[in-house]
């Protein structure tokens, strides 16, 4: 099922689940990855889904098309990205877990990025949510990964210095025509 933003959607914090929620109307609810301790004070006042939210939704949805994720996982990633932009407290970078490339790439919000774990050299796929001059807030754009003994799941947030990030090139996104 494809979800489409509309003006009936509502943001609210659910004390019972300790999560930021989005009421998608028609009985559908989205429970974000983000608990109370991660949220700004604005998260605790119910709010409507605004035009800016819808614009960001479509922007992230378009950028997430090339991720190797199911439609449901892509929708979850996009909605968590909206929560992160709107309600997540500022974070400190946790870049020591990742290999530095010595190059400074400044990604844009919505960019697909990747990093390599310093202990295993495993590639980790990320969605850039907010970008700064030196670091970017990213969401995990794969089902799971273990970083320094901590399991992270799809949509979990982590801030990373830009010298660790690389643009992700997804071969599946290229369309190759056969030469005759």
Swiss-Prot record:
One Pfam family, short name: ZapC_N
Gene Ontology cellular component list: cytoplasm
GO terms of biological process kind: division septum assembly; FtsZ-dependent cytokinesis
Keywords: Cell cycle, Cell division, Cytoplasm, Septation
Superkingdom of origin organism: Bacteria
Location (main, coarse): cytoplasm
Localization in the cell: Cytoplasm
Function field: Contributes to the efficiency of the cell division process by stabilizing the polymeric form of the cell division protein FtsZ. Acts by promoting interactions between FtsZ protofilaments and suppressing the GTPase activity of FtsZ.
Similarity remark: Belongs to the ZapC family.
Quaternary data: Interacts directly with FtsZ.
Name the record gives this protein: Cell division protein ZapC
